[in-house]
UniProtKB/Swiss-Prot annotation:
Entry binding sites for ATP: 12-19
Stated name of the protein: Nucleotide-binding protein llmg_1557
Tagged with keyword Nucleotide-binding: yes
Record keywords: ATP-binding, GTP-binding, Nucleotide-binding
Function statement: Displays ATPase and GTPase activities.
NCBIfam families with a match to the protein in the record: PRK05416.1
Organism in which the protein naturally occurs: Lactococcus lactis subsp. cremoris (strain MG1363)
Classification via InterPro entries: P-loop_NTPase, RapZ-like, RapZ-like_N, RapZ_C
Amino acid sequence: MDNKLNIVIITGMSGAGKTVAIQSFEDMGYFTVDNIPPNLIEKFVGLLNTPDNKIDKVALVVDMRSRAFFEDIQSIVTELTDNTSVNFKLLFLDANDTELVSRYKETRRSHPLAIDGRTLDGITKEREILADLKNLSEVVIDTSELTPRNLRARILQKFATSTESTFRIEVMSFGFKYGLPLDADLVFDVRFLPNPHYISELRDKNGTDQEVYDYVMEHPQSEEFYQNLMKMLVPILPAYKKEGKSVLTIAFGCTGGQHRSVAFAERVSAALREKWHLNVSHRDKDRRKETVNRS
């Protein structure tokens, strides 16, 4: 098994998409650093490349914002390439002059090397400075015709391993009386189901307890809802992934977030976990118990 530290340096033309790139690596679980001065890279890698280090993937953005130190970058790239204790790749993002000028006009920002505000002059100068670095790059992506979503997909295609999940599903339960979860993408209200709260022997239990789970699921409307829900979810989840979404949060709500919503979150997460990278959580499952204990 290869336990080497994986390092990707992201560089290229200003305006070519380095922000999208570093966000894509973050979604793949990389530890990311934006605009690191090149002369600090060797020391930074040394701190991480130790036996007790728990960070195994690092993506660093180096560009002309660090121009005072940029002359060091080629020697550092050479050193990392020759370093047998790390896996190193250099990613260069490029775009044609017309597209770069258009992007700068759209954002109304100045090019870091622009002379007297002339964007094209800055682009020309930057292209000359980066020419040798581009030739050293293992991966070059021209973003001229790529949308941010397309660029993200291209990066995932080239850098994501078969064992990495770039799309994660968060299944959660909550109680409406405590408010909607702000980060939920899909919210399902299960308050139409019979409430175990009114069964004395179930009141103090929750949807992770087998007795409560069985009570919730034994009703015909529960099974009908579950079957219809899965018919909807199964085809749309791949579409969310294809659109470039990194996390999809599916929330189930009942009155207090203790019984019905918990049971359904458990059942749905168990079904989806066979195919998807998934986490399940219960925001309000123990809130009533905590309130009673404080009183």
